[in-house]
């Protein structure tokens, strides 16, 4: 007589967590940090078309790592929810905390009820409405629905430990935008360094955007081209600076399966 396969609940949760963490670690790093006028997002992203950073609503931005099709589905769902709430009530009734809670609930439900968890990690950033003097806020949402507000910066994806250590050493509160970009780029470069003195890989293309509190309505702005080059450190010379020009994907890679 054969017995059905049995795994304890604890083992199932451990297996799901390990699967999600491995998927997230394969993605390239994203840094979100606060600066004097809002929130800065800097992502290592060699792709022109697959964006890891996005506007969600007037004063709210979104960044993610992991499986593109999974976090893009969450991003679009958040945009639709925010549009409906802003239309039904008032645009000021849409907040980053509400969106972060919705993402956390969705990821928690998927993690607990579906066979495969989403291999994603999210960051929701928010700046105060124009004319208000409130500090920017960053929320981290993990694959299992855990949510935490971070006071200064968030690091997700890839080799996070050296990126975090670099920010601990260099980050200064209320820095100017150029300085903040320098902190983020230096941290991302630390994440690409080889272990034990071995040669690391070059930092790929950058996707850069900000939430600017000084903008009257829509705070989100992408930084590209000459504007981005003027903000980059003098010793930074990647092949791309706008998240473009990636070589053709390896066989089997697609928009639906690619890790970002």
UniProtKB/Swiss-Prot annotation:
Location of this chain's protein in the cell: Cytoplasm
Keyword terms: Cytoplasm, Proteasome
Main location: cytoplasm
Pfam family, any one: Proteasome
Span of the signal peptide: none
Alphabetical list of Gene3D superfamilies matching this protein: Glutamine Phosphoribosylpyrophosphate, subunit 1, domain 1
GO BP: any one term: modification-dependent protein catabolic process
Activity control: The formation of the proteasomal ATPase ARC-20S proteasome complex, likely via the docking of the C-termini of ARC into the intersubunit pockets in the alpha-rings, may trigger opening of the gate for substrate entry. Interconversion between the open-gate and close-gate conformations leads to a dynamic regulation of the 20S proteasome proteolysis activity.
Cytoplasm keyword on record: yes
GO cellular component: cytoplasm; proteasome core complex, alpha-subunit complex
Pathway membership: Protein degradation; proteasomal Pup-dependent pathway
Region feature (Disordered): 231-260
Disulfide bonds: none
GO MF, one annotated term: threonine-type endopeptidase activity
Function: Component of the proteasome core, a large protease complex with broad specificity involved in protein degradation.
Family of the protein in this entry: Belongs to the peptidase T1A family.
Subunit: The 20S proteasome core is composed of 14 alpha and 14 beta subunits that assemble into four stacked heptameric rings, resulting in a barrel-shaped structure. The two inner rings, each composed of seven catalytic beta subunits, are sandwiched by two outer rings, each composed of seven alpha subunits. The catalytic chamber with the active sites is on the inside of the barrel. Has a gated structure, the ends of the cylinder being occluded by the N-termini of the alpha-subunits. Is capped by the proteasome-associated ATPase, ARC.
Listed name of the protein: Proteasome subunit alpha
Organism: Mycobacteroides abscessus (strain ATCC 19977 / DSM 44196 / CCUG 20993 / CIP 104536 / JCM 13569 / NCTC 13031 / TMC 1543 / L948) (Mycobacterium abscessus)
Gene, per the UniProt record: prcA
């Amino acid at each position: 007589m054969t017995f059905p396969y049995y795994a304890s609940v604890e083992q199932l949760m451990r297996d799901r967590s390990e699967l999600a963490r491995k998927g997230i670690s394969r993605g390239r790093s994203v840094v979100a940090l606060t600066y004097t006028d809002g929130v800065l997002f800097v992502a290592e992203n060699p792709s022109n078309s697959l964006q890891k950073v996005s506007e969600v609503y007037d004063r709210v931005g979104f960044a993610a790592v992991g499986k593109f099709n999974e976090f893009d589905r969450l991003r679009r769902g958040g945009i639709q929810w925010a549009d409906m709430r802003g239309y039904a009530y008032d645009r000021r009734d849409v907040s980053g905390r509400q969106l972060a809670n919705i993402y956390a609930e969705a990821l928690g439900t998927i993690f607990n009820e579906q066979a495969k968890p989403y291999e994603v990690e999210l960051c929701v950033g928010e700046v105060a409405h124009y004319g208000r003097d409130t500090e920017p806020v960053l929320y981290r949402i993990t694959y299992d629905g855990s949510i935490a507000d971070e006071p200064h910066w968030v690091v997700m994806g890839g080799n996070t430990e050296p990126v975090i250590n670099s920010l601990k050493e260099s980050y200064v509160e209320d820095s100017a935008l150029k300085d903040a970009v320098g902190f983020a780029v230096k941290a991302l470069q630390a994440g690409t360094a080889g272990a034990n003195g071995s040669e690391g890989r070059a930092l790929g293309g950058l996707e850069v955007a900000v939430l600017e509190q000084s903008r009257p309505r829509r705070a989100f702005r992408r930084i590209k081209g000459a504007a981005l080059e003027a903000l980059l450190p003098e010793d930074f010379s990647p092949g791309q600076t706008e998240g473009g020009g990636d070589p053709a994907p390896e066989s089997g890679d697609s928009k639906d399966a690619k890790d970002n």
